Amino acid sequence: MSDDTVTPMMAQYLEIKAQHPGAILFYRMGDFYEMFFEDAALAAEALDIALTKRGKHKGEDIAMCGVPIHAAEGYLLTLIRKGFRVAIAEQMEDPAEAKKRGSKSVVRREVVRLVTPGTLTEDSLLEARRHNFLCAFAEIRDEAALAWADISTGEFSVTPCPLPRLLPELARLAPRELLVADERPLDWIEEVGCALTPLARASFDSASAEKRLCTLFGVGTLDSFGNFTRPELSAMGALVDYLDLTQRGKLPLLRPPVREVAGGTVQIDAATRRNLEITQALTGGREGSLLSAVDRTVTAPGARLLERRLSSPSRDLGLIHDRLAAVSWLTDEPRLREDLRASLRRVPDMDRALSRLALDRAGPRDMAAIRAGLTQAEAIAGRMPADAPSLLAETLEALRGHENLVDLLDQALVAEPPLLVRDGGFIAPGFDDDLDETRRLRDEGRGVIASMQAGFIETTGIQSLKIKHNNVLGYFIEVTSTHAEKMLSPPLSESFIHRQTTAGQVRFTTVALSELETRILNAGNRALELEKMHFAALRTAILDQAGAIGRAARALAEVDLIAAFADLAVAEDWTEPQVDDSRAFAIEAGRHPVVERALRRTGTPFVANDCDLSKAETPAVWLITGPNMAGKSTFLRQNALIALLAQAGSFVPARRAHIGLVSQIFSRVGASDDLARGRSTFMVEMVETAAILNQADDRALVILDEIGRGTATWDGLSIAWATLEHLHDTNRCRALFATHYHEMTALAGKLTGVENATVSVKEWQGEVIFLHEVRRGAADRSYGVQVARLAGLPASVIERARTVLDALESGERESGPRRQALIDDLPLFRAAPPPPAPAAPPKASQVEERLRAIQPDDLSPREALKLLYDLRALLP
């Protein structure tokens, strides 16, 4: 065969690959998925597996690599996480069937699934405690919408979304994949933060989208689901079209779409989410985030619901009150709370099991998960008293009424079923008499094998003779090579038929063994076919009740979250916040939940602080001054997080909290260069500040830290001053504004809504002690040089800094020509003095001398008390 001749198998591969140019093709060949050409080179590098070759094409070697079927999911996960899409081409017939069409016929193969980041369903490919959203963005003239779905759970929603709101919405949902029309300019692609998939404009056609959705949900009109705009229909239709493409016609079990109205949740932009570390720490992981600090859920659906609540705090007062009332009730019911959590720990992920059943990717364990979840649902409903708050009482209907399905699954399934249908053995004995009889025949045949082996040993006199089985030879008789000559010679050779010789072993069969093997295989195959038939029937029975099962799963997640919030409140001594439609913001003894948790590990107590921005009908701004390291940023963040937690339906880390409904949370705390877009730290800071000033309404909560620090002093002061005035006069919102520009404290006397606050420090023998206490008033200095010394700057640098600082401060105290002369005579351009000699240790104070002379074990209680008074008298 010449190099240019394409084999039938390779011709089939190239044809399938041409239909999926943007994906790596997993091409099934027996027990392996093989990859060829460029796919092989890409996959071998990404998966760190060997790259080989197989034949030639157009004179060039064909690159090849492969992964075993049994380990394919792990390799798939690696490829998906590295940004690849994978098309899976399976063998659609047995090789024996292909040979009936001719000796050169190729096994028929088809792509059964296109695996992408937003279309995962297998547990091994998903994060159990996080959603896996697929989003679609559609624009029609001046309107736009965003639809999203998690096909692993069935959640399906849509919301109006003008382009300026797209990035904040994507930050809220954190999708794995975004679908856009292929003609859409992608100038914002680097900000999306997920895989971006362009689709043909036809996928976004709103007219065909409506028909597509009606077909999916089996309805004649979508009116019962909501009054959707054309962009909303377009976005939902594109999403469903993409699912049809990737799942090859096996659409997931999506719930009817929920239309989220604009303004239903607190608006939080991407920068604020990042700064507040709501679901992800600045280091990139979950640890160190608010989510990590407050997560006490015991089920995967409960954990996913918690993430959604923290990402989307509610603005619905009635809903907030219902959630808080349920949490409050469970804090007062410790025994019930622990019983509920004990039952919830036994609840599997029913949502994802149900989704796999709908997509025909499930195994017996998914059915067992449905059985276990519904069993616990009944148990939890039975524990819930009649006087439970409305939110918990509403779950009872969803948790009850599953007895018939649970009984069916109990009768049909063994207690611990295998993972895969092909493994068999998952249908319980006694469920089907025919299956039981077939299994008996199969198992008796295996018993006969043992008897036959004993007979062969007696006949041959070879004690090491064994009857074994593999997938190639079936059942065979094996002896070591030392006995080969005996077995191959008369009279044994007349009944023992030689099959195979390997290194060290020789294998034989007999007519009787072959006949027995046929009977065993027939019984085994029939038993497996009967089990597959029952699996299909059970799958249908489960999917017939998919709606009720989904409602039970969501009810269990709600109970889990309420119980988790209650457990958190009791364990951490959190308080129920008062949330109303006032403009109040009064926090007494508030704490930062993440920082407090971190300090507890070191045995360090957290210093709680008050915050009051409760000026009625007027803006309320605290202008906070104080040194670095004193805790200003922590104070700012903790108050934003307290507001967020309250509107998410949680108790809060404070002694008391009264929060008037917050519509938006904005945070400009910390900054870094955006090198990819050529933006400096100062530019990033200004862009984020501009977004706040342009968008914050009078119910927003804004926290700003060190505005203007990235430029020249007077420029920075001017920008910070004007920003604070704009917040006060135009936005008229509640705000915490931290600054090092002490000149700004004068605004407290000029703007009625501005008050000064400072973080206290104490100086002791030249040392700075940070008290982390916020009090009314202004700081008198910044202590920057002292902080630099604590950071470990060389003593010569610290001394030089003090010299410059003294000159600058004396210049500020002068005026007119004298001040200018001092500025001109600054020591900035003089030669620096030589490094000072190491300072002698300071002379011990009288208190220290007395303490060193004490032998505590020799003191009586009376002497110790007297000594304490003496030491107090020695203090200056």
Curated annotation (Swiss-Prot):
It comes from the Bacteria. One of its GO terms (molecular function) is damaged DNA binding. GO terms for cellular component: cytosol. Residues 832-841 have a biased composition (Pro residues). CDD domains: ABC_MutS1 (cd03284). Keywords: ATP-binding, DNA damage, DNA repair, DNA-binding, Nucleotide-binding. This protein is involved in the repair of mismatches in DNA. It is possible that it carries out the mismatch recognition step. This protein has a weak ATPase activity. Belongs to the DNA mismatch repair MutS family. HAMAP family: MutS. This is DNA mismatch repair protein MutS. It comes from Cereibacter sphaeroides (strain ATCC 17025 / ATH 2.4.3). The lineage of its organism: Bacteria, Pseudomonadati, Pseudomonadota, Alphaproteobacteria, Rhodobacterales. The gene is mutS.
